[in-house]
Design a protein with these regions (language model features):
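Glycine-rich Rossmann NAD(P)(H)-binding loop
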Residues: 168, 190-195, 222-230, 240-243, ...
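Conserved C-terminal active-site "lid" loop/helix of NAD(P)H-dependent oxidoreductases
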Residues: 202, 237, 260-301
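Mid/C-terminal beta-alpha module of Rossmann-like enzyme folds, strongest
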Residues: 212-276, 307-322
């Protein structure tokens, strides 16, 4: 852990934060979870904190040497839209101000590959910014705030990590919904299924976050992706093989799928209820989302789980005999 004495995991009650806390416990790293929501697994390590409330931040960050910021509004359908900016952007401003006021010189920020938007080729850290939604736009704004914080002094350390979509046991996001549909045997493949998808396994990204504690002062930017990328067809084959099922995917033309998505958007707007299908989710599903990192090789990191093994572990624990 080097010179650091105590780590604050802001937004640490969630999926990535809990997996990170598991590793901190194993490695005897002193940490506090700062979150609006009480940590179910590590209640004794938790303190209430809201990144939009500067007073609660500065009070609870006192005594820490390094901040890992995992807090974010990230779902597709956050309302009002201003919440993305209140949490992701104003939260970044508050964290940077608190860090300066408390003389904390080290910040690790989890951004997102959403800052690149839809990509047509494998995209590394030099990719062009073109976020298509408010999540990506707010993450990009937050990055600029952290960059300005770092540039204000020569002795600071800023690690900005842009993970691709994260999955693992216990997560109930878009990847879980995809795995569940495939595992159910009632999966409709919209499009050809040849689009490649980059993913990141939660235990691997947690291990990388631990690894960042040893980084020296300076600026560090890394896309986090577990390679190799699978096409949707390959991914479904891995899942069906794991479950011992026959691959029986029904394929639907893209134009039919996207029209269905717009129909669900209308129903959702009329009913005021979130529905499992939307046009944006179908666009994401059918898009080629392929990312890589040119920078990660500089940090001597080896992910503990190969991607195929991580998928099999997740599918086995979530869907086997269910």
């Amino acid at each position: 852990m080097g010179v650091f004495m105590k780590v604050a995991i802001v937004g640490g009650s969630g999926f990535i934060g809990t997996n990170l806390a598991d590793l901190f416990i194993d490695k005897d790293i002193n940490f506090t979870i700062l979150d609006k929501v009480k940590s179910e697994k590590y209640a004794e390590k938790w303190k209430y904190c809201d990144v939009t409330d500067y007073a609660s931040l500065v009070e609870n960050l006192s005594g820490h040497d390094l901040i890992i910021n995992l807090a974010a509004e990230h779902k597709d359908n956050v309302r009002p839209i201003s919440l993305y900016y209140q949490v992701n952007v104003d939260g970044a401003k508050n964290i940077c101000k608190a860090a300066d006021d408390l003389n904390i010189k080290n910040i690790v920020f989890t951004s997102s590959v959403a800052v690149y938007g839809f990509v047509e080729k494998d995209t590394d850290e030099s990719g062009v910014f073109s976020p298509f939604n408010h999540y990506g736009k707010s993450k990009l704004e937050a990055e600029k705030i952290y960059d300005a914080w770092f540039a204000s002094s020569s002795d600071k350390k800023l690690v900005t990590i842009r993970p691709t979509v994260v999955f693992g046991v216990g997560n109930r996001g878009n990847v879980y919904n995809l795995f569940r549909q495939i595992a159910s045997g009632k999966f409709l493949m919209i499009g050809s299924g040849e689009n490649e998808k980059s993913m990141a396994y939660v235990e691997n990204i947690a291990a990388f976050l631990v690894h960042t504690l040893s980084f020296p002062a300076g600026y560090h930017l890394i896309n986090y992706v577990d390679k190799p990328d699978f096409t949707m067809n390959e991914l479904s084959t891995v899942i069906y093989t794991c479950l011992g099922k026959r691959n029986k995917i029904i394929k639907v033309p893209y134009v039919v799928g996207i029209c269905a998505g717009y129909t669900f958007d209308l129903f959702s707007k009329i009913s005021g209820k979130e529905l499992p299908v939307s046009s944006i989710r179908i666009k994401k599903f059918c898009a080629k989302t392929q990312f890589s990192s040119s920078n990660i090789s500089n940090y001597n990191f080896s992910a503990p789980y190969p991607l195929r093994d991580a998928i099999v572990k997740t599918v086995s624990q979530e869907f086997m005999d269910k």
